[in-house]
Regions:
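Active-site-proximal cofactor/substrate-binding loop regions of enzyme domains
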Residues: 1-47
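Helical substrate-recognition/capping region of FAD-dependent monooxygenase/halogenase enzymes
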Residues: 35-187
Length: 187
């Protein structure tokens, strides 16, 4: 039995992240369950769910609680470390992008567990929509791949100009992206 979303963690309402966290929970679980049903992965892969999602959701909950303090105008000194001054004098909250906790992939890879950037490939379609719930391997122009498994989609850097920037951002020649769009490994 797996518990996901608000059944697993009650999210304060201030950032609208309760349903988002639930969707990320289900996204994390669904591709793993699909592979277990198809017998392409051992059921032990499901053990990574709680480890991976805990720290990610925890950071959202903590930030949402700080946002609640801000919204409720509680003592401003409590939240001063989460607010930054802008050049125009306005104040903004720092954005968060929590990584997955330990689970699948090498924890020695500093990019493992980070969310893969989203970008549009046309006015009406995003890169994510092209590869729904499929693992993808993004490879740079430098790499010459021979035959790979047909279970993973290979996307060449030259296919989309945005991939050049992304490979550079992660200092990688290849990025293995999980079906839930978190980075499994960079090479």
């Amino acid at each position: 039995v797996f518990i996901a979303g608000d059944a697993a963690h009650l999210m304060p309402p201030f950032m609208g992240q309760g349903m988002c966290a639930g969707i990320r929970d289900v996204s994390n679980l669904s591709w793993k369950i699909i592979h277990c049903v198809k017998k392409t992965h051992n059921e032990k892969i499901l053990n990574s769910f709680q480890k991976e999602r805990f720290s990610n959701v925890k950071e959202y909950i903590e930030t949402t609680m700080k946002m609640g303090e801000f919204i409720n105008a509680m003592r401003s000194y409590k939240i001063s470390n989460t607010i930054s001054d802008q050049s125009n004098g306005s104040k903004t909250m720092k954005s968060i992008k929590p990584e997955l906790g330990p689970g699948l992939g090498s924890t020695l890879d500093k990019n493992r567990g980070r969310i893969f950037p989203k970008f549009n490939i046309s006015k009406s379609k995003s890169f994510d929509e092209l590869f729904s719930f499929e693992p993808i391997l993004i490879v740079s122009k430098k790499l010459k791949l021979k035959k790979m498994s047909n279970k993973i989609k290979i996307v060449k850097e030259s296919s989309y100009k945005e991939l050049t920037k992304i490979l550079k951002k992660f200092n990688a020649d290849a990025i293995l992206v999980r079906p839930d769009r978190f980075i499994l490994q960079t090479f």
